[in-house]
UniProtKB/Swiss-Prot annotation:
GO terms for molecular function: acetylcholine receptor inhibitor activity; ion channel regulator activity; toxin activity. Binds with high affinity to muscular (alpha-1/CHRNA1) and neuronal (alpha-7/CHRNA7) nicotinic acetylcholine receptor (nAChR) and inhibits acetylcholine from binding to the receptor, thereby impairing neuromuscular and neuronal transmission. Pfam families: Toxin_cobra-type. This is Alpha-elapitoxin-Aa2d. The lineage of its organism: Eukaryota, Metazoa, Chordata, Craniata, Vertebrata. Belongs to the three-finger toxin family. Long-chain subfamily. Type II alpha-neurotoxin sub-subfamily. It comes from the Eukaryota. InterPro entries: Snake_3FTx, Snake_toxin-like_sf, Snake_toxin_con_site, Toxin_cobra-type. Keywords: Acetylcholine receptor inhibiting toxin, Disulfide bond, Ion channel impairing toxin, Neurotoxin, Postsynaptic neurotoxin, Secreted, Toxin. CDD domains: TFP_snake_toxin. Disulfide bonds join C3-C21, C14-C42, C27-C31, C46-C57, C58-C63. The keyword Mitochondrion does not apply. Gene3D superfamilies: CD59.
Amino acid sequence: VICYRKYTNNVKTCPDGENVCYTKMWCDGFCTSRGKVVELGCAATCPIRKPGNEVKCCSTNKCNHPPKRKKRRP
């Protein structure tokens, strides 16, 4: 399976045994100014969701699209 791995159109073919694409999002100390931290990648199984985190998993090529960022005000 092919998954996105950064906030660009940067994709990679997952290693053997990793057939799930995931998107993990959470807030850090800069959440109010920068938005949520986003991690994209491949895994053998869907990562476990921790309190305060969002996790989305899928298993088709390029299915973990990077979320759209809000536009900054000038």
